[in-house]
Amino acid sequence: YNDIKQFDQLTLSNVEFTTTNLCNMRCSHCAVGYTLQTKDPDPLPMNLIYQRLDEIPNLRTMSITGGEPMFSKKSINNVVKPLLKYAHQRGIYVQMNSNLTLPQDRYLEIAEYIDVMHISHNWGTIQEFAEVGFGAMKKQPPLKAKLKLYEQMLDNASTLSDQGMFVSAETMLNQNTLPHLENIHKEIVNDMKCSRHEVHPMYPADFASQLNVLSLKDMKQAIHHLLDIRDKNTWMLFGTLPIYPCINDENDQVLLERLRNEKNITVRNDPDGRSRLNVNVFSGDVIVTDFGDENGTISNIKNDKLTDVFDAWLSTDLAKSLNCHCEAFQCLGPNVLVKNMYYPNTNFRENEIAMHTEHSFQ
């Protein structure tokens, strides 16, 4: 919502780079599992990537994702480090998305360039890590090797946190995590010593399209449960919630009020398509989200400026149907996945007009 306040409109301020298609795991819930390969192609020239970044006047943040961005030393040296140094020189915030299972020295080597180290942590038990974390892998590693990665992840998170890195662990709300939310939260806070626990509902996208998602009722109960049992001294961030001030549901409003008033709680608007585009460093393809199945590739940096791509996306009927905003609650409405899953027949633009009228923001 900072872009709305500063520029009075949605603005491209965040670029996410897919820097590798390699990963040492094959999580059943991975949003990009279908793209994973055993060998990376050659990346585009970094000068082209720098040029496209230079053309974005309001760039605030950059995300590095994969695959596992820290898996391939070649990718780290040829793509990741150059991007990190570019961001550092320009004063851009950087988030690295990693599973934190790799040797610690790889993370320490880039620590000075990282503002947020983001890890997905959905493991209620070690057995779940061993099964779900490699659920889509055809040839399974030995159990001992899997457990070693789990211990490496815990140790890396704890050590990096102790050394001052901001480590943020994200948990997806789905049928698998629901029974274990308290244990997951305690492990993130006490064992991994993370600075923040992020919570997002799981939506079925591409590779993870067969997931057992939660009903709206179960999801709301899970959020209340987390608010009841959480460590109130640890920052919790809730994102992509399918709960909006403009939906006339009393239970929704009670939950939103609780989220607004509790200590160390933030509710985040979804950045995909509102402030962020994803760029593949190998093909140059640009997508609105890092999972892309709703919209597919919308352009390519070999041909177009990212600011032009973003403006063209905002002019589409799909984007227009989603791009509402409510100043009273600093809410930017749903993304494509949320609308299609929970509110296929809701006109959020009409809701926007009603909310502006009700709260006297014309």
Each model region followed by its residue ranges:
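Hydrophobic pocket-lining residues within nucleotide cofactor-binding pockets
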Residues: 69, 101-103, 173, 202, ...
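Flexible mid-to-C-terminal extensions adjoining Fe-S/redox cofactors in radical SAM and related proteins
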Residues: 1-11, 285-362
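Short cysteine clusters
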Residues: 23, 27-30, 270-274, 289, ...
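Radical SAM enzyme [4Fe-4S]-AdoMet core and its adjacent flexible, acidic
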Residues: 39, 54, 90, 116, ...
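Activation segment
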Residues: 27, 73, 104, 128, ...
